[in-house]
A protein has these predicted regions:
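Structured catalytic-domain cores with a bias toward divalent-metal coordination
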Residues: 1-416
Length: 416
C-alpha cells in the first residue's frame, strides 16, 4: 500500500521545478547520451505535451546531433511531412498543407498547430545542414495507403516485383478499405492475404540493393511493404486476440525504427514520440501479466538499457481533445483532478507547479512501489476514468524520467 505522505516527501526531495526549456537542460543532457530518446504523453490531445516534447526535440537535434523524429503516426502521411521538411515537396506551400495528408481518424494527433510549428522548424533547420533531419511514422494502420505506395514506386522504376505487389493489393480489394471486414474474413472464413504480402515483402528485401539509386525512396518502399505485411497480421489478430494485435503493432514500430536507424547509419540517434503506454516499459505495469510488450520494453531489450532514455508525461488536471467513441467527432473534454492516491495526485501534492524527476540508482527504489498512473486515449470518458484510466505502474522502472505539467490545455487541431 502506498504511503502517500512518504511518497510526497520523496518527490519533494527529488523533483526539480521548471518554467521553460532552459530549466530542462540537465534532463536533456542526461537523455542525449542515449541512442533513442522516447518522449511520452498521457493523452493524444494535450497541447503542453506536444510543445514540451517539441522543445526537447529541437535541443536534441540542434545541440546533440539527433538525426530524426519518429512518431506514433502512419508512415505514408508522415513521409509527406518528411518530404516537406527536406525541401522535396514543392506541391506544399507550408507545413499545414503537408499535414493535411493525415486523413485517417484521429487526424488531430498530427494535423494540428503544435506539430505544424515543429515541422516548420525542422524545415528551417535543414536548410543549413548537409545531413537532413527526417520525420517518420512508425505505426501499422496504413494498410491500403502503404500498398498503393509500393505499387506506384515499383511501377515507376519498372521493377519485375510490381506484379507481386498488384497481386497482394488485389487480394485486399474486396474489403473496400474496411480493415475490420478483412480481419473477420481472415480470422473466421480463411480469406487471408498473408501469403501474398509475405511473398511481396520477401521479394523486396531480397532485391533491396536494386532500389538504391534513391536511398530514401527505397526506404519509403521497404517500410510501406513492412507496414502491409504487419498490418495484415494486426487486423487478422485484432478480431480474435486484442493482446496479440497490440504486440504485433508495437513490434512493428520497433521494426520500422530499425529500418530508419539503418538508413541513417550506425551512429544515428532518434527522438520517438508516442503515448506513455507505448514508451513506458510494459514490464513495470500490469501489461506484463497479460503477456503484452511495448516499444519501451522492446527497445531496451534490443539496444540496451543505457541506449534508451524514456521520459513519461502527466498532468493533474486540465482539458484535452478526445472523442466519445471510435471514429466520432473530436471535442474538448475536461481532465478531472487526478484520483486521490494516484501518481499524478501525489506529484501535485508535492507542489502545485510544473516539475521533472530523473530516476537514478540513488533514488530508484523510492519509486518502485506500484501506483495508479493516468492514461487517456483518443476515446475518453472523464466521468468514468477512475474505473479504467489508471495503469498500475512502478514509475522508476517504467521510465528514466518523468515530466509533470500541473494544469494542461487541449491541443489545437485543424478541422478538415
Amino acid at each position: 500500500m502506498i504511503k502517500t505522505d512518504q511518497y510526497v516527501e520523496h518527490i519533494k526531495q527529488h523533483a526539480v521545478r521548471f518554467a521553460n526549456t532552459a530549466d530542462l537542460e540537465p534532463l536533456i543532457k542526461a537523455a542525449a547520451n542515449a541512442k533513442y530518446v522516447l518522449l511520452g504523453e498521457a493523452s493524444h490531445g494535450t497541447s503542453e505535451f506536444y510543445t514540451t516534447r517539441a522543445e526537447i526535440t529541437k535541443k536534441l537535434i540542434e545541440e546533440h546531433g539527433f538525426s530524426f523524429v519518429a512518431v506514433e503516426g502512419d508512415w505514408p502521411a508522415c513521409f509527406e511531412a518528411n518530404r516537406y521538411i527536406k525541401g522535396n515537396a514543392p506541391e506544399y506551400s507550408n507545413a499545414a498543407e503537408a499535414l493535411h495528408s493525415f486523413h485517417r481518424w484521429p487526424a488531430w494527433m498530427w494535423a494540428n498547430e503544435e506539430v505544424t510549428r515543429l515541422v516548420e522548424w525542422l524545415r528551417a533547420f535543414n536548410r543549413n545542414q548537409n545531413k537532413q533531419v527526417g520525420f517518420y511514422g512508425m505505426d501499422v494502420y496504413s494498410l491500403w495507403e502503404s500498398m498503393e505506395a509500393v505499387v506506384q514506386y515499383l511501377e515507376k522504376i519498372n521493377s519485375p516485383a510490381v506484379d507481386k505487389a498488384k497481386k497482394a493489393f488485389e487480394c485486399f480489394e474486396p474489403f473496400h478499405r474496411q480493415p475490420e471486414q478483412y480481419g473477420i474474413s481472415a480470422a473466421f472464413y480463411g480469406e487471408s492475404c498473408m501469403s501474398e504480402v509475405m511473398d511481396l515483402l520477401e521479394t523486396i528485401q531480397q532485391n533491396r540493393k536494386t532500389y538504391d539509386n534513391n536511398p530514401e525512396s527505397s526506404l519509403n518502399m521497404q517500410v510501406n511493404a513492412l507496414v502491409a505485411s504487419n498490418a495484415e497480421a494486426y487486423y487478422h489478430a485484432m478480431v480474435t486476440n486484442g493482446n496479440e494485435s497490440w504486440n504485433i503493432r508495437d513490434r512493428h514500430m520497433v521494426e520500422a525504427l530499425d529500418y530508419i536507424g539503418t538508413y541513417y547509419g550506425p551512429e544515428s540517434k532518434g527522438v520517438i514520440w508516442e503515448h506513455n503506454t507505448h514508451i513506458g516499459d510494459a514490464r513495470a505495469t500490469d501489461m506484463a501479466q497479460e503477456g503484452m510488450v511495448n516499444v519501451g520494453q522492446l527497445t531496451r531489450e534490443k539496444y540496451g538499457q543505457d541506449q534508451v532514455y524514456a521520459i513519461g508525461f502527466g498532468t493533474h488536471r486540465g482539458t484535452v481533445i478526445a472523442a466519445g467513441k471510435w471514429g466520432e467527432a473530436m471535442e474538448v473534454m475536461p481532465v478531472p483532478k487526478a484520483m486521490p492516491g494516484s501518481w499524478e495526485d501525489v506529484v501535485h501534492q508535492a507542489g502545485e507547479f510544473n516539475k521533472y524527476m530523473m530516476f537514478t540508482p540513488e533514488n530508484q527504489e523510492l519509486f518502485q512501489e506500484t501506483i495508479g498512473h493516468r492514461a487517456i486515449g483518443v476515446v475518453y470518458h472523464p466521468e468514468m476514468e477512475r474505473f479504467g484510466n489508471y495503469v498500475p505502474s512502478r514509475l522508476s522502472e517504467r521510465y528514466d524520467a518523468f515530466i509533470h505539467i500541473d494544469e494542461t490545455s487541449a491541443l489545437s487541431p485543424y478541422v478538415f
